[in-house]
A protein has these predicted regions:
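Cys/His-rich Zn2+-binding cysteine-cluster or related metal-binding knuckle/ribbon modules and their
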Residues: 2-8, 16, 26-91
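Residue-level signal for pocket-adjacent positions within structured domains
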Residues: 27-28, 42, 55, 67, ...
Length: 198
């Protein structure tokens, strides 16, 4: 696309988004250009607002607008069961299954020696601190079923088992090498229900 500098700047920024290539960036840019100013401003303000008001939950490291995320703050959630995920984006697919009523702990990634990500780079110490609460009965390891996720789950299981807390892993059925955010609700729901103890 032969573009003015302002349009090119928009295209360059859109292409930085995950999954957005040149053609998608061009479609989005044309949509923005063709929308009235009110709609474009509303989009820009929503982006600024989310960057200004959303931070990490002080307990589980999910996204939150208050000190605690909505899940941690809910009296309806089972605080005795903690589901450990790699990233905040892994929570919505699990929530959509309607089969999990516990709380979460977001690690902020997965162990990956090749990328220089070790235990100190993740929220593992905070998870272990949460397990000092004697009411915690089970930890479900819901890291991605890839090499990094399996390595992280094995490492966590070795740390948690001696604490006397039941440790389980999502059952197979999720594709190996896949990511939770792309799993359908039925497959993910069955994986939660058929989780196995480690």
């Amino acid at each position: 696309m032969n573009a003015t500098s302002a349009i090119q700047k928009l295209l360059d920024e859109l292409e930085r988004l995950p999954g957005i290539g040149p053609k998608s960036a061009q479609r989005i840019a044309y949509w923005i250009l063709n929308e009235d100013r009110v709609d474009a401003t509303r989009l820009a303000q929503a982006i600024i607002e989310v960057k200004d008001t959303v931070h990490f939950c002080s307990r589980c490291f999910n996204y939150a607008q208050d000190e605690l995320c909505d899940i941690c703050a809910s009296p309806k959630r089972d605080q005795n069961t903690i589901c450990v995920v790699s990233e905040p984006r892994d929570i919505p697919p699990i929530e959509r299954t309607g089969t999990f009523s516990g709380v979460y702990h977001v690690l902020g990634g997965a162990l990956s020696p090749l990328e220089g990500i070790g235990p100190d780079d993740l929220h593992i110490a905070e998870l272990l601190a949460r397990l000092n609460n004697p009411s915690v009965a089970e930890v479900i390891l819901a890291t991605n079923p890839n090499i990094e996720g399996e390595t992280t789950a094995s490492y966590l299981a070795r740390l948690i088992k001696p604490l006397g807390v039941k440790v389980s892993r999502l059952a197979s059925g999720l594709p190996v090498g896949g990511d939770l955010e792309f799993a359908d609700e039925v497959t993910l729901g069955r994986a939660i229900e058929a989780r196995r103890e480690l």
